[in-house]
Amino acid sequence: EVECLPGPTAFVPALVSSGLPSDRFSFEGFLPVKKGRTKRLKELSTETKTMVFYESPHRILKTLNDLSNYFEVESQISVSRELTKLYEETFRGTIKESVEHFEKNKTKGEFVIVLSPK
């Protein structure tokens, strides 16, 4: 088990604890909410390196569903919330499993998604 100490950004502990390849990655931040979202997802769908996204609790399920439409559903993903806080939680699995998990488990907090498209 890896424990990463907090720093100034949430994506670094999420990336390290994800267990996904971190030798090459891109930080994508928040995906566009409306305008440009589909275009950005299409652009990212050909990416081969690990990608890191931020997402709000109100859009987490939509974003996971969108990712499942543009990437292989068996792609590995890690979804972390409330990093370094009392209710810290990380889900690891496939995109498909993450959609199923978050359909059943409504959670609060800000999320960091780490996606390995390979």
Residue ranges and their predicted role:
Residues E1-E47:
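Class I SAM-dependent methyltransferase SAM-binding "motif I" and its flanking Rossmann-like core
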Residues K49-T50, Y54-K118:
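A contiguous loop/helix-start segment that scaffolds small-molecule binding in enzyme catalytic cores
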